[in-house]
Amino acid sequence: MSIDSLPPLREVIERHDLMPKKSLGQNFLFDLNLTSKIARQAGDLRDQPVIEVGPGPGGLTRALLAQGAYVTAIERDDRCLEALAEIAAHYPGRLRIIAGDALEQDFTALFPEGPKPRIVANLPYNVGTQLLLNWLLVEPWPPFYSSMTLMFQREVAERIVAKLDSDHYGRLGVLAGWRTQAKIAFDVPPQAFTPPPKVMSSVVHIVPRETPLPCRAEALGQITQAAFGQRRKMLRQSLKSIGGAALLEKTGIDGTRRAETLSVEEFVALANACLP
């Protein structure tokens, strides 16, 4: 069944009264060329498992299925479930719909065997960053997914791929740089969405590193949260609540430096210094 044999998305949205909810961070994609481009960015999807978070009325879902994927779609907006069920009827056995909150989902339990899924999603803007942090800090590593192809606001995308000495370097850049290789694949203009957001969006492609620098994810998460939570303060002050003086002494890192001047390797050293 081709993507063109399904009713137009605008018709589906009107029939099911699916106006996007700001409270859920929803911005629906209508452009079939764009949804197909996002799906292609994830690689060859023929007979491959894919996790999609926040499918809404199913614009990207259609593109993923048309390219041969087996899709597990997680949607917390009950209004969208009937529209997704109609898509599932066109692709028997290829679309699994889970009604629920992705932030509460145990993703590692979704695919207990077989090839690792790819995560492909136009993430709801209000939970996208937290979901990414969860996926970057997940244990064990290598993770449950083989790659991530995700839509973010452009400013968030720049923070994900940021390197030391760049304006956008921060906690996301450290954690993504530690465990993955991330790149901005392409931009998506506001007019591609309904309703159009006020900012440009970007698709980011993320591939896990098989062997990142040895470090406890929980410790690195804590260190980066403290350091960048007060990024304008010196490290001896921003890390004070988590025993920063001892950590800085152990690692030989100057306490008068600020978080934005530390490399990924130096953050890993601080996290490892947390070990008893």
Curated annotation (Swiss-Prot):
GO CC terms of this entry: cytosol
This protein's UniProt keywords: Cytoplasm, Methyltransferase, RNA-binding, rRNA processing, S-adenosyl-L-methionine, Transferase
Catalytic activity: adenosine(1518)/adenosine(1519) in 16S rRNA + 4 S-adenosyl-L-methionine = N(6)-dimethyladenosine(1518)/N(6)-dimethyladenosine(1519) in 16S rRNA + 4 S-adenosyl-L-homocysteine + 4 H(+)
Subcellular locations according to the entry: Cytoplasm
Xref: InterPro entries: KsgA/Erm, rRNA_Ade_diMease-like_C, rRNA_Ade_Mease_Trfase_CS, rRNA_Ade_methylase_Trfase_N, rRNA_adenine_dimethylase, SAM-dependent_MTases_sf
Enzyme class: transferase
GO molecular function, one term: 16S rRNA (adenine(1518)-N(6)/adenine(1519)-N(6))-dimethyltransferase activity
EC number: 2.1.1.182
Major subcellular location class: cytoplasm
Sites where the protein binds S-adenosyl-L-methionine: 27, 29, 54, 75, 101, 122
Highest rank taxon of the organism: Bacteria
Pfam families for this protein: RrnaAD
PROSITE patterns with a match to the protein in the record: RRNA_A_DIMETH, SAM_RNA_A_N6_MT
Family membership: Belongs to the class I-like SAM-binding methyltransferase superfamily. rRNA adenine N(6)-methyltransferase family. RsmA subfamily.
Function text: Specifically dimethylates two adjacent adenosines (A1518 and A1519) in the loop of a conserved hairpin near the 3'-end of 16S rRNA in the 30S particle. May play a critical role in biogenesis of 30S subunits.
Protein name: Ribosomal RNA small subunit methyltransferase A
Species per Swiss-Prot/TrEMBL record: Brucella melitensis biotype 1 (strain ATCC 23456 / CCUG 17765 / NCTC 10094 / 16M)
Organism phylogeny: Bacteria, Pseudomonadati, Pseudomonadota, Alphaproteobacteria, Hyphomicrobiales
